[in-house]
């Protein structure tokens, strides 16, 4: 029984945090090289970035809800809730950082595109 419990615990810990939270993180879009991309590629990338940002907002709301639930469980003294809360908070912060990086990369691509295509 102890081995089964240990295996189950190890298995659960190896799951990505989004799987344990029932929140699906959006895929990060690829940003084209602005120096060589066509206008059509830049417009398509802009659409993908906007879609990513909207999906990420939904994801952050989901993680935020899970964090609130875990905080309530922490307040009730449930074992393991503090660790789950910390994992959710780290996941939330990583998603915010990922979105900031996508925005920075896309803005850099726009500047590079404009520099390469001054028309």
Regions found by a protein language model. Name each.
Residues 20-68:
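Immediate post-signal-peptide N-terminus of mature secreted/exported proteins
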Residues 16-17, 56, 100:
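Processing junctions and N-termini across compartments
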Residues 2-22:
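Classic N-terminal secretory signal peptides
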Residues 8-9, 38, 45, 92:
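Residues at structural and domain junctions
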